[in-house]
Amino acid sequence: NGVSNAEILEINPEFAKEITILDKLRYDILTHEKGGKIRLNLEVTYIFGDTGTGKSRYIWEHFSDEVCVITNYKGNGTFDGLKPTHDVLVFEEFRDSIKLKDMLNYCDIYPISAPSRYADKPIFATKIFIISNWKFEKQYSEEQIIDPESYQAFLRRIHKIMEFKKDGEIITYNSVNEYFKEKNISIVSEFKLEKVSDETFQNLINGK
């Protein structure tokens, strides 16, 4: 019924020796219940701001302990800590840290499993946060040029952008379009504009 390990141990400390079995049972039950289902309620939020502005603290203050934080992007153990009970998935310190095509899958509503060292882990999270010091438009700047179609798909995955300011202000943009309009940013990153001809830039905007 959704009782956590801590709550079980509070009821009866004797179950401490059975925690591993309980975790396995919980994993099997949740995988059976949630596996293959479309996450129609999935919300993907991009959070950015300078170090020390409270980006990570915001997650822990607003959500339960069922949070999986990804910090290691090297090797095949990135998702080792992911559990079926994790409703919130956080990509911390994200700087083009995962290939764009993989990120598109992880942020999609359709059933997907993420690779880990021992067995692939299904992603059941209904809230995904991408946290970075980088402004949103800096992510995947190369792909904006060489694979604009995939980049457009990435833009469609993002439901909300939150900007954390040094003075403590949090500005929320309820869509990528709202953010781009407010910041007067073109679809192609401003970090790459000097390397692209006017004709190429216009074609990319027009989806050609």
Go through the PLM ranges and name each one.
Residues 41-64:
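Glycine-rich phosphate-binding P-loop
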Residues 32-35, 55, 74-78, 114-118, ...:
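A generic local structural motif
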Residues 45-47, 68, 89, 129, ...:
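Hydrophobic/aromatic beta-strand patches that form the interior of the parallel beta-sheet core
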Residues 38-41, 63, 81-86, 121-124:
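Flexible, charged surface loops at secondary-structure boundaries
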Residues 48-49, 93-95, 133-134:
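Structural motif
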Residues 2-41:
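N-terminal pre-Walker A segment at the start of P-loop NTPase domains
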Residues 65-99:
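AAA+/P-loop NTPase substrate/partner-engagement loops
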